[in-house]
Every structure is written in C-alpha cells, then in structure tokens.
C-alpha cells in the first residue's frame, strides 16, 4: 500500500456466480465505508459460504472487519462508523437525519423493493452460484407462501408500471434537492441507491423507463466515490 492510499476496511460481500455484488445491504455498507473516506477491501462470499467464514458466527451479510472489530448489519455498521470516526464526514449529521433515513427506508422497502423482489426472485435464483440455487429456491418459496418462483414472477411486465408510479414521492423529493440528504448524499441516499444496484445485479426485465427522472440521481449516485456503483456486470435499469 502506498503512503497516500486510504486505510481500508474489510467488507464481506454477497456475490452472484459472476462475482457481482447482489445484496442491497452490503451496498449500503460499501457506500458508508467510502463516504467515511476509507477504501473497501471486498471479500466475495456466496450464500452457502456465509457460514464458512468468521467461524460461522454470522448467518447473513454484510459484516465488516475494521482492524479486528467485527460489525454485522448495515444500520449497525453505519452507526459504528459515525461513532468511531466522528472526525470524518457523517452518515447521520443529527439524530433527526437518522430518523428521516429510517423513515425513508421504511417507505422504500415495502413500496418499491418488496414488489420488485417478486418480479426478480427467479432472476436471483438463476444468477447465483450453482451451489446456492437449491437454498434460494427453498428459502424464497417458503417466504412466498409455498408458491413456485416461476409463478411469482409471472406477469411482472404488467406489474412494473404500478411499481414505477409508486416511486413518485422519490421523484418529487429529488426534483427539489440534489440528494435526499440535501446538498450532500447521506445514508438515505445510500439506502435508495442500493436498492437500484440490487435490481441492476439481477434483472432480466428492467424496472425503469429510459426517460425516468430518477436517472439523474441514480447516475450521480453510482458515480460517487470514484464510480463505486459502476460495475460492468450490472444489467441496465431501463430497456
């Protein structure tokens, strides 16, 4: 490492068969680390590999290793980074800003991500490593009430327009300010951008239309921190 290179924080990353990061929660942690000015040392892990790392302590990702300190869960990681490195750019400038990020996440997940999950759950299955596919099918079909993945995604093209319309409050907010954090991106932006990065990692039926106003924010967000969200393995978000 050169004398001027930023110190890195290790991030255990959930990946597809092609090595592309899939988890929106890992993406949140990745953005949080970069926002604090640290380099990300990503360690790729498959679904079935999670229990094989770190002595089997964790059953889900992200996990960071910051000089021997292990932190699990994207919100806990953000809080840890702000608490441990208060001299670096904050993820939550105030308690109120954190509360608003929680509010946004509580709206965005059931309104946008959960419906998109039902559109892309079969894509998720098809793009994971071969050894992960049985687990993905069994766990997702159980979560979805026993429905076959093929049946869940059927008719998704007809459902996508309603999901796009449900994003309208996000478009309205971003028409008045460059970021959800105002003049600078904050954790709410990372929650939203990470959802679109998840969709870009697996979709075979793009969620957005080419003229969607959200692309101004999405593209600027993907370009942050030296193009953190730019990965040639990602799939288009619009046809």
Label every model-predicted segment:
Residues 1-134:
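GST-like domain detector, emphasizing the conserved glutathione-binding G-site
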Residues 44-49, 185, 234-236:
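Acidic carboxylate-rich catalytic motifs and surrounding loops in phosphoryl-/glycosyl-chemistry enzymes
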Residues 78, 82, 102-105, 160, ...:
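Non-transmembrane alpha-helical segments in soluble domains
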Residues 110-216:
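GST-like fold's C-terminal all-alpha helical module
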Residues 199-239:
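Long, positively charged, glycine-interspersed low-complexity recognition regions
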């Amino acid at each position: 490492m050169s004398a001027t290179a930023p110190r890195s924080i290790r991030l255990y990353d959930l990946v597809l068969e092609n090595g592309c990061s899939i988890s929106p929660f890992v993406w949140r942690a990745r953005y949080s680390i970069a926002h604090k000015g640290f380099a990300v040392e990503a360690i790729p892990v498959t679904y079935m590999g999670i229990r094989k790392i770190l002595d089997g302590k964790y059953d889900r990702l992200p996990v960071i290793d910051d000089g021997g300190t292990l932190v699990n869960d994207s919100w806990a990681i953000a809080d840890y980074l702000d608490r441990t490195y208060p001299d670096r750019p904050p993820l939550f400038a105030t308690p109120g800003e954190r509360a608003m990020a929680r509010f946004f996440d509580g709206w965005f997940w059931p309104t946008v991500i959960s419906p998109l999950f039902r559109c892309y759950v079969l894509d998720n299955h098809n793009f994971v490593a071969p050894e992960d596919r049985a687990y993905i099918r069994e766990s997702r079909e159980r979560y979805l009430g026993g429905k076959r993945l093929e049946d869940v995604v059927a008719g998704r093209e007809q459902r996508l327009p309603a999901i796009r319309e449900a994003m309208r409050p996000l478009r309205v907010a971003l028409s008045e300010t460059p970021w959800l954090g105002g003049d600078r991106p904050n954790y709410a932006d990372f929650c939203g951008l990470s959802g679109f990065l998840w969709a870009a990692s697996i979709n075979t039926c793009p969620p957005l239309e080419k003229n969607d106003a959200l692309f101004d924010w999405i593209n600027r967000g993907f370009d942050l921190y030296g193009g953190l969200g730019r990965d040639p393995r990602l799939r288009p978000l619009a046809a």
